[in-house]
A protein has these predicted regions:
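Intrinsically disordered, low-complexity terminal tails and inter-domain linkers enriched
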Residues: 62-89
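Extended interfacial segments that mediate partner engagement and assembly in macromolecular machines
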Residues: 28-30, 42, 47-53
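Short, Lys/Arg- and Gly-enriched loop/turn segments at beta-strand edges
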Residues: 10, 30-39
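Ferredoxin-reductase
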Residues: 1-19
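Short glycine/serine/threonine-rich phosphate/pyrophosphate-binding segments
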Residues: 50-56, 151-154
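Short, charged beta-turn/beta-strand-edge "cap" motif at the junction between a beta-strand
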Residues: 27-32, 190
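Generic structural signal for buried aliphatic residues
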Residues: 22-25
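Reductase modules of NAD(P)H-dependent flavoproteins
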Residues: 75, 80, 94-191
Length: 191
């Protein structure tokens, strides 16, 4: 999933592709989440961080996530035909959008109880994802989140205030994709 971000961009080039066109892709890059089995989880996505949380929800329900102490690619083994486990934890999904231009709502509802916050109140709770958590009296032991930096900072503070574990995935622009050019460096203390 992607959004065309302007003229002359890579996303515009993607939008012009048709079935059968060939492209070279480097990925996936980065690290996934190590899921804590048995802990009630919030899966929280905002903006470009929404789609990765759908895949995490699917993986949790299929039992193909990496859990503490497992080998790094154990989830991949399950996807390639190993025995499929059951869901590793209960979860509530909370998604944040600017306005009514939401996406993937039906797909999230197929995975778990799903809640929406929009900045303008056009869908779900008016405000941010924390407002949706409070309005719906949701509780969890751990947060897995992906999205814009202000949302991640707020969730980190919320987790500390509620004595919860919090794992975040930062979606930042990256040039080379492997860390060589240092364009993707994020100061973790700023999150």
């Amino acid at each position: 999933m992607y959004r065309v971000t302007g003229e002359g961009t890579g996303t515009e080039e993607f939008s012009k592709l048709v079935r059968g066109d060939k492209v070279r892709i480097l990925g996936p890059l980065g690290n996934g989440f190590t899921v804590q089995p048995g802990k009630k989880a919030f899966l929280i996505g905002g903006g470009i961080g929404v789609p990765p949380m759908l895949q995490l929800a699917k993986d949790i329900n299929a039992g193909i996530v990496q859990t503490p102490g497992e080998e790094k690619n154990s989830g991949q083994a399950a996807m390639e035909g190993a025995e499929i486990k059951t869901a590793v934890c209960d979860m509530n999904i909370v998604m944040g959008y600017r306005d009514e231009n939401t996406f993937l709502l039906d797909e999230f509802k197929e995975q778990a109880a799903s809640f929406v916050a929009t900045e303008d109140g056009s869908v779900g709770t008016k405000g941010n994802v924390i407002d949706a958590i409070k309005e719906n009296a949701l509780e969890a032991d751990v947060i897995y989140a992906c999205g814009p930096m202000p949302m991640l900072r707020a969730l980190k503070a919320y987790a500390a205030e509620h004595d919860m574990d919090c794992f975040i995935s930062m979606e930042e622009r990256m040039a080379c994709g492997i860390g060589a050019c240092l364009a993707c460096v994020c100061k973790s203390k700023d999150v």
